[in-house]
C-alpha cells in the first residue's frame, strides 16, 4: 500500500498536475482499490448487466442489418433477374417499332383495297363464264 502511495506521490511531483492535489487516500484505501473491491463484491450483478446490455445491442444490430447469407441469396436472385431482364430486352429490341406497325397498317389497307378490286374482277369473270357455260349448254 505504501509503495503505491509513493509511486503516486512521485508521479504527481514529476508532472505537477492540478489533479495531484486530490487526496491520495480516502479512509486508508485508495479510490482504485475501492473500485476493484466494489467490482469484486458485485461481479455477478455487473457481469449479468453487461451480458444483458451486449445481448440487447446484438439483437438490435441483428434486426437492423442483413446477414451475409441473406445478402448472398439476394445477390443470386438479382443475378437471375438480370438474366431474365436481358432476355426480355433482347425480345423487345426485336419487336417492330411504331413506324413499322404504321407501315404494316398502310400495307394491309392497300391489300384490302386490292382484294376488293380483284374480287369485283373475279365476280365479273365468273358471271361471264357462267353466261358462256349457259350458251354452250343451249347449243
From Swiss-Prot:
- Its protein name is Uncharacterized protein HI_1498
From which domain of life does this come?
Answer: Bacteria
InterPro entries from the entry? Phage_Mu_Releasin (IPR020269)
The main place the protein resides is membrane
Name the keywords, alphabetized. Answer: Membrane, Transmembrane, Transmembrane helix
Q: Per UniProt, what is the membrane topology? A: Single-pass membrane protein
Where does the record place it? Membrane
Q: Where are the transmembrane segments?
A: 43-59
Asked whether the keyword Transmembrane is assigned, the reply is: yes
- List the GO terms this entry assigns under cellular component, sorted alphabetically: membrane
